[in-house]
Amino acid sequence: MRLSLSAWRPPDWLVYGAIVAAALAGSLSRRERAMAPEPPPPVPGAAGMPISPDSPLAASPITSVTPAAARGAQTGFSVGEAGVWMTAAAGLGRCRTPGVVAAEGRAAPAVRRPGADAVLVVTTPGAGAPGVPLAAMHDLQAGELGFVPGFPKGGPGEVAARLLGPQTRRVLARFEANEPVLAWAEIGHTEGLKGARPGLVGAPVLDRAGRAVGVLLGESPRRGRIYTTTPDGLRRALAAAGVTPGAAGAGQPIGTDNYGRAADGLRRDLRVVQVVCLRAG
């Protein structure tokens, strides 16, 4: 259901920020490029192996993922070992039972939490991975770096970007969000990653300290833009869901020279995962 935006009017600083962002975007697109190497290949035979007892999701019931569900997979991430996960709400709007993928073709059923707007919070009670730490609530500055690890086309990949600034009401309506949406200019991605990347939706945007500062809501490949929530939006989503994520894992410093390796580690530890719909509502 599309949310009404009539009660929210963009303040002057947002309008001016959009103008500054456009100028910054043009400047960035002309001079910066930071590519990441291709991720390591999958381990042969891993698809049919049992879930390891050391897996963060080993204590959860596991169900098979149908090919149709796998094709619709998006990215999500852990925010605490208590089994609390975040992703984008749009792709799972009519999903009754989401699933957190534990291994290829297998997922742990998750419980939807109430209060979702642009961000969806789900839980896997009794099983969870070390959380991605959340950045403190603060205003990001134009030009800051962000790194997006995930599963762009059903497989591993990542994007690097620089923050442009808050977007206008028209962009808010596109994402059915009633809070600010941030735009970032892409400056790099995994080698060989081309075209639209629907599977990256729901991924965390990480700052240079490895802390989540937003959730990826969508992209504009032709313009080289990605769109995310704000840091405040993450904590509001948790509060609306009525969950306490528990202790998060340590953040890892990330830069343009190592964001590919950092993303590989987050995926390997199931701190960044695929999220699928196991049963439609």
Regions found by a protein language model. Give the residues of each.
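Hydrophobic membrane-insertion alpha-helices, especially the h-region
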Residues: D12-S27
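Active-site region of chymotrypsin-like
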Residues: P56-A68, L120-G131, G157-P245
